[in-house]
């Protein structure tokens, strides 16, 4: 079995904490939180692309 796509124990714990926090949010706050997370993911993706591009050239 490929282990690269599995979460670490620390990641599983963080996910459980996020689930608990999400259940307490109302719809507006949930949407706002989702937008913030998506923005963070896009920034992370851009950072990874930047480092990959600059490490090859």
Curated annotation (Swiss-Prot):
SUPFAM superfamilies: NblA-like (SSF109859)
UniProt-listed Gene3D superfamilies: Phycobilisome degradation protein NblA (1.10.287.670)
Compartments it resides in: Plastid, Chloroplast
UniProt keyword annotations, A-Z: Chloroplast, Plastid
One Pfam assignment: NblA
InterPro entries found in the cross-reference section: NblA, NblA_sf
Recorded GO CC terms: chloroplast
Major site of localization recorded for this protein: plastid
Family: Belongs to the ycf18/nblA family.
Descriptive protein name: Uncharacterized protein ycf18
Protein's organism: Aglaothamnion neglectum
Gene name per UniProt: ycf18
